[in-house]
Amino acid sequence: MCLTNGKDRSKCLIVLLLPVFLMCGCIKHEVLSPVPSITGIRFVDSGQNATMYVEFTDGDGNFGLEQSDSLGIFSECINAYNLYAEYYELQNGNWVHIKIDPCDDPVPDPDVPYYYKIPWAKPTGQNQIQDGVIEIALTSWKIESDFDTVKFIVRIVDRDIQSSNAFEIGPLVK
């Protein structure tokens, strides 16, 4: 039927190509939660210093802070950070949280260990999903104490102040 004349061939071509175009429109794009998620952490100890690699996803692509983020919800001290690594020591068989909070000080210390401002890598294009690895250089990560085993519980927070899952790394021997 498609081989008889030019008019029929055009109709046949349309009928044959229509399913191809419809299938292309049905390609599913990955959908992730708009709440950020930590998917893994790798910790590399190099003596006094260490590096923490935090693997994460964010479905709406709004994880990260800009330098100008200091007003509104970001004016509260705790919201000025977006990666929190809480420090715990194993003391006499129990994990004890060693609170190091920059917001407890009337003049917050910008260099407080374990709270970080991760810059915003704005996604471009239609797919706004962020899927990446954050590299954190931990200088002097070993707090002086009588105990030698520690762990971190890490979480990230996006621009909507949505907190990720808490991800535990450790035990680590100092």
Segment roles from a protein language model:
Residues M1-R9:
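N-terminal secretory signal peptides that target proteins for export/translocation
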Residues L3, L16-L18:
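Leucine-biased recognition of intrinsically disordered, low-complexity hydrophobic segments
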Residues S10-L16:
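Sec-dependent signal peptide recognition
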Residues L22-G25:
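C-terminal motif of bacterial Sec signal peptides marking the signal peptidase cleavage site
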Residues I27-K174:
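Non-catalytic macromolecular-recognition regions in eukaryotic signaling proteins
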